[in-house]
From Swiss-Prot:
Highest rank taxon of the organism: Bacteria
SUPFAM superfamilies: EPT/RTPC-like (SSF55205), RNA 3'-terminal phosphate cyclase, RPTC, insert domain (SSF52913)
Subcellular compartments: Cytoplasm
Protein name (database record): RNA 3'-terminal phosphate cyclase
EC numbers for this chain: 6.5.1.4
Annotated signal peptide: none
Family: Belongs to the RNA 3'-terminal cyclase family. Type 1 subfamily.
GO biological process entries: RNA processing
Function: Catalyzes the conversion of 3'-phosphate to a 2',3'-cyclic phosphodiester at the end of RNA. The mechanism of action of the enzyme occurs in 3 steps: (A) adenylation of the enzyme by ATP; (B) transfer of adenylate to an RNA-N3'P to produce RNA-N3'PP5'A; (C) and attack of the adjacent 2'-hydroxyl on the 3'-phosphorus in the diester linkage to produce the cyclic end product. The biological role of this enzyme is unknown but it is likely to function in some aspects of cellular RNA processing.
UniProt organism field: Escherichia coli (strain 55989 / EAEC)
Main subcellular location: cytoplasm
InterPro entries, per the entry: RNA3'-term_phos_cycl_insert, RNA3'_phos_cyclase_dom, RNA3'_phos_cyclase_dom_sf, RNA3'_term_phos_cyc, RNA3'_term_phos_cyc_type_1, RNA3'_term_phos_cycl-like_CS, RNA3'P_cycl/enolpyr_Trfase_a/b, RPTC_insert
Gene3D superfamilies: RNA 3'-terminal phosphate cyclase domain, RNA 3'-terminal phosphate cyclase, insert domain
Pfam family, one: RTC
Length: 338
């Protein structure tokens, strides 16, 4: 019998990332775990619908035995079974992030006995989670370089707080892993601004694009009007294509916050990224830790290592026989497998 791993959900960033990473790694390695103080660092601790959906999805995909899978629960025991490929559908029942549920189960399906398709309904444009376009345009091309082949499709938008969106991913088992090396970004090739609107006046998008264009030379300026029943909602994004990587940044609009302020938040975030030569942005760094650890080698450079990143590394090191090294030089941190 494999040893039980005990995790403290209050460590590091104290949010849902510890649970999601633990579920992924438990399914992959077959190691059971317990976690206490789930989301202790949040205003509303314990399992929310999004986290409970991730637990139930993991349970279905590998036939796990679970204790504590209830709304508001701050303790969970998870004993994984065998991961099975197939077609799966999960409904969050709120505007909780579809992509974070997918992030939990897809790594396990990289090791399944056949191809899979996973469809999740819930929120697609959430201020605290990567949107589907980030997964599709930024993360998945990098996963392909590692040898991981999956394809995400946004079937219907669902803005926070209404939800109602649908995201699906098709994934194939990994034949072999390659080493990812991401050092400096290189020269910028082009920058693309994009605004999504659903049930929001078009002038909001025009003002957001104007704010972006006032700070950056945009090669493309796209405004997409979505059906009203997919909103109300508004997301403004800026994609930076460089010689060695494509990064994408976004801000979700809020009620009673002007278009100019929303776009200015995005401008600030992109300028922070461009101020460093590092290829990898703060949020992408979180997503690369697990696939790089599974490959057993690789490195990337990030300007601003987040608490999420450090927490994710700590959880990965509990399940896998790998050790990460972080070396900071001139404001850039090199993250590598030692």
């Amino acid at each position: 019998m494999k040893r039980m791993i005990a995790l403290d959900g209050a460590q590091g960033e104290g949010g849902g990332q510890i649970l999601r990473s633990a579920l992924s790694l438990s399914m992959i390695t077959g190691q059971p775990f317990t976690i206490t103080s789930i989301r202790a660092g949040r205003a509303k601790p314990g399992l929310l619908r999004q986290h409970l959906t991730a637990v139930k999805a993991a349970t279905e995909i590998c036939g796990a035995t679970v204790e504590g899978a209830e709304l508001g629960s701050q303790r969970l025991l998870f004993r994984p079974g065998t991961v099975r490929g197939g077609e799966y559908r999960f409904a969050i029942g709120s505007a909780g992030s579809c992509t974070l549920v997918l992030q939990t189960v897809l790594p396990a399906l990289w090791f399944a006995d056949g191809p899979s398709r996973v469809e999740v309904s819930g929120g697609t444009d959430n201020p605290s989670a990567p949107p589907a376009d980030f997964i599709r345009r930024v993360l998945e091309p990098l996963l392909a370089k590692i040898g991981i082949h999956q394809q995400t499709t946004l079937l219907r938008h669902g803005f926070y707080p209404a939800g109602g969106g649908v995201v699906a991913t098709e994934v194939s088992p990994v034949a072999s892993f390659n080493t990812l090396q991401l050092g400096e970004r290189g020269n910028i090739v082009q920058m693309r601004g994009e605004v999504l609107l659903a049930g929001v006046p078009r002038h909001v998008a025009e003002r957001e694009i104007a704010t972006l264009a006032g700070s950056f030379s945009l090669h493309e300026q796209n405004i997409h009007n979505l059906p009203r029943d997919q909103g109300p909602g508004n997301t403004v994004s800026l994609e930076v294509e460089s010689e060695n990587i494509t990064e994408r940044f976004f801000v979700v609009g809020e009620k009673r916050v002007s278009a100019e302020v929303v776009a200015a938040q995005l401008v600030k975030e992109v300028k922070r990224y461009l101020a460093s030569p590092a290829a990898v942005g703060e949020y992408l760094a979180d997503q690369l830790v697990l696939p790089m650890a599974l490959a057993g080698a690789g490195e990337f450079k990030v300007a601003h290592p987040s608490c999420h990143l450090l927490t994710n590394i700590a959880v990965v090191e509990r399940f896998l026989p790998v050790r990460f090294g972080l070396i900071e030089t001139d404001g850039v941190t090199r993250v590598s497998i030692e």
